[in-house]
A protein has these predicted regions:
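C-terminal nucleotide
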Residues: 7-48, 52-60, 71-77, 97-103, ...
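Residue-level recognition of the N-termini of beta-strands and the immediately preceding loop/turn
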Residues: 62-64
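Hydrophobic alpha-helical hairpins/lids featuring a short glycine-rich hinge
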Residues: 67-68
Length: 303
């Protein structure tokens, strides 16, 4: 709770189309199959539950055919690009638009985050925050206990969404620094949920160390945000190096691996670098000063 992060979107999209239909069906380009809203299929369970959850908010029971075009997965490869959060964001926008329910980006974030909390889907919700913006997003995580208290009080979905969430901040960042982010797929898949479970199991033994880690991380993230906004690529690279050092400090006491050997080699071949997400797989980031403007290059060939 209250932890901050800078998260960037990637030049890959999830697009959702909806059209009127006699019954509600879901088709996606990954599974290449269509299922009914109440039809049993493990590949669609999350989406089916989310659609039913949205009806609590919209109070609308229109039937429709929903199609999901997903560029964040390909050829059965998991890239670690936050696709589950992005899918739910795209579905929420499509359904609310289809049902003529007004919304803004904050509404969409809260709907997806609340659904995840109610279904015990752990995580920072950073992928959700990144999915509502293009480019870089500054995100401060809400106080989860504040939201859980509203759930325990049996407040309606609409009441919870319309309440200001303690600690939540989502802000679009406009980078001016001449910096290139070189994002590369490692080919080594990692499940963020497993890292979260592992940390929850051991965190009570390292309360002070974790407090130091979070305090340092939040300070460095704010510094990096300022570096990016002030055309200060040199300072940004230095801040990124310090962020990596802090993550390796977390690794030292949490025993959660941050970098594989492949990732270390990639990072050390760039001016600065770090893992993406919870570490140990999926995407690794290299950073270089350039002579043009801020840019992100995503390479999904296996490292």
């Amino acid at each position: 709770d209250y932890a901050s992060a800078l998260i960037t979107s990637v030049p890959k999209k999830i697009t959702v189309f909806i059209e009127n239909s006699n019954e509600t069906t879901i088709f996606d380009t990954i599974n290449k199959t269509s299922v009914g809203l109440h039809e049993e299929n493990s590949n669609f369970t999350l989406v089916q539950k989310f659609i039913l959850f949205l009806t609590e908010y919209t109070s609308c029971n229109k039937t429709f055919a929903l199609t999901i075009y997903n560029e964040l997965h390909n050829d059965d490869k998991k890239y670690g690009l936050g696709s589950s959060g992005a899918v739910l964001v795209a579905i929420a926008r499509a359904i609310l638009s289809f049902e003529n329910v007004s919304y803004n980006d904050l509404t969409i974030f809260k709907l997806v985050a609340l659904f995840n909390i109610k279904h015990n889907l752990s995580g920072s919700m950073g992928d959700v925050a990144a999915s509502i913006n293009d480019g870089i997003t500054y995100y401060e995580k809400f106080n989860a206990e504040f939201v859980n208290n509203m759930i325990r009080q049996d407040k309606s979905v609409k009441e919870i969404i319309n309440t200001d969430w303690d600690g939540l901040r989502i802000e679009k960042v406009y980078p001016k620094a001449d910096l290139s982010i070189l994002a590369r797929w490692t080919g080594e898949a990692v499940d963020t949920k497993e890292h979260v479970k592992l940390w929850k199991k051991h965190k009570d033994n390292y309360k002070e160390e974790f407090r130091v880690f979070v305090k340092t991380s939040n300070k460095l993230v704010k510094t990096l945000k300022e570096n990016l906004e002030r055309t200060d690529a040199t300072s940004a690279l230095n801040t990124i190096r310090k962020l990596r050092e802090n993550l390796l400090y977390l690794e030292s006491f949490s025993k959660i691996p941050m970098e594989t050997k492949t990732m270390k080699n990639y990072i050390e071949n760039h001016s600065a670098g770090k893992q993406s997400g919870s570490g140990s797989g999926d995407i690794v980031l290299g950073f270089e000063k350039n002579n043009d403007k801020y840019q992100l290059q995503l390479n999904l060939e296996k490292l």
